[in-house]
Design a protein with these regions (language model features):
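Non-catalytic terminal/accessory segments
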Residues: 1-290
Length: 292
């Protein structure tokens, strides 16, 4: 049996080369991946949180893992509905949270590791959300090296996780994951529904917030938008090679140099501070890049 590291490394290499992967479902028969998933989930605070059953991390065993694998071999795995709770947001509103049972959570983590290994090398370098070793800090680091940027557009996709179209998501996955059994397993998971106040409700769209696999699925879905921006929109609207310099900035630079030659360091420093407040290039220039 191959180690989890070996399996994920092979998948990662396929992802780097943007080559399709096959027989993904068979990877779910590898016990090492479940032990890897268990080690990942066990330290989390939510490990003891119950779903719609009393099953928690303490009830996991090698025997249960083997039984889960056997059920998967028979293609009889049944996802259980998530238990829905609501948590308060900073703005006072409430956000729905879907809590899966422990067995489903472990299987989701195995699937997440496979998907992450394959898709992570293909994601945009300008994407920072829900990604390993990335976040607000890396986004800020990228912004710091931008030049001539005066405008930022802040946007929010309302209820993004809840509105992801299942059909489109599955079509995106099926492009490069040539394994009908694995795609069906994902589809069944998306349609497992949830219990709210012990009443079953169907899920016709979205991925559950609180699901281990949900962030990677959301990123795979939104990566289509990133690709469109970088491959279609940027080439279409990017003109010229560089922006024209800002006359006001150049004027201050010349004045600073003059003052330094005259020995007036104090006034020169004041102008340096003032110059920092304006861009060095003309942000209204037609050569201005739409996206950097």
């Amino acid at each position: 049996m191959r180690t989890a590291k070996t399996v994920l490394t092979v998948i990662q290499e396929r992802g780097k080369q943007k080559k399709p992967i096959e027989r993904v479902y068979k990877l779910l028969f590898n016990r090492e991946l479940y032990l890897n998933a268990y080690a990942k989930l066990y330290p989390n605070n939510g490990a003891m949180t119950k779903g719609v059953t009393n099953e928690t991390v303490d009830g996991m065993s090698i025997q249960k893992i083997d039984r889960m694998i056997e059920i998967l071999r028979e293609e009889k795995y049944q996802w259980k509905p998530a238990r829905r709770e609501y948590i308060k947001k900073k703005n006072g509103k409430k956000r729905p949270l879907g809590i899966p049972v422990w067995g489903d959570k472990v299987l989701q983590e195995v699937m997440r590791q496979i998907l992450e290994a394959y898709y992570e090398p293909q994601f945009s370098e300008h994407s920072h959300g829900f990604r390993p070793n990335r976040g607000c800090h890396t986004a800020l680091q990228e912004i710091q090296v931008w030049k001539g940027t005066r405008w930022f557009i802040e946007g929010d996709i309302s209820q993004y996780f809840d509105t992801i179209d299942h059909k489109i998501l599955l079509e995106i996955l099926a492009r490069n994951i040539h394994d009908g059994r694995f795609i069906r397993l994902v589809s069944n998971m998306l349609e497992a529904g949830y219990l709210e106040e012990w009443k079953f409700k169907q899920t016709i769209s979205g991925v559950p917030q609180g699901g281990v696999i949900s962030p990677i699925l959301a990123n795979i879905y939104l990566n289509e938008f990133d690709n469109w921006i970088e491959e279609v929109l940027i080439p279409k609207y990017t003109k010229g090679k560089r922006q024209k310099s800002n006359p006001e900035y150049n004027k201050l630079t010349a004045e600073i140099q003059k003052l330094r030659k005259e020995g007036d360091a104090k006034t020169a420093h004041q102008l340096v501070v003032e110059r920092r407040k304006i861009p060095s290039v003309n942000t209204q220039d037609e050569n201005c890049l739409l996206y950097t």
